[in-house]
Design a protein with these regions (language model features):
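Acidic/histidine-rich, surface-exposed loop or edge segments in extracytoplasmic proteins
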Residues: 1-10
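Extracytoplasmic
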Residues: 14-45, 52-92
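Short glycine-rich or small-residue beta-strand-to-loop segments that form or flank ligand, phosphate
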Residues: 5, 47-49
């Protein structure tokens, strides 16, 4: 699947706090989107959403960039493992 990478930094002094701060902003503006702050040495990353298609992620990316133009330059769609909700009564 796909997610939107909003932030990635390896500055050990500020990266974690920046990722968590930006996560809070996105959660307030888009509560329906899951957020994921991860640390894979040496990078702290903030990724958003669980999208099955690149097109679906791209549409969400447009909305995120409109809401947060100051962060738009760093935002991009990335391939990632995603969480898929399976609704009761259906099997996959």
């Amino acid at each position: 699947g796909f997610r939107i990478q909003v932030f990635s930094d390896n500055d050990y002094r500020t990266a974690k706090n920046n990722a968590l701060y930006k996560e809070g902003l996105i959660q307030q503006a888009f509560p329906e989107l899951e957020t994921y702050v991860t640390f894979t040495s040496p990078f702290w990353r903030l990724r958003v959403g669980d999208f099955r298609s690149y097109e679906e992620a791209g549409n969400a990316l447009i909305q995120l960039k409109k809401e947060f133009p100051q962060m738009a330059r760093e935002m991009r769609v990335v391939r990632d493992k995603i969480h898929i909700q399976i609704h009761q009564g259906f099997t996959e």
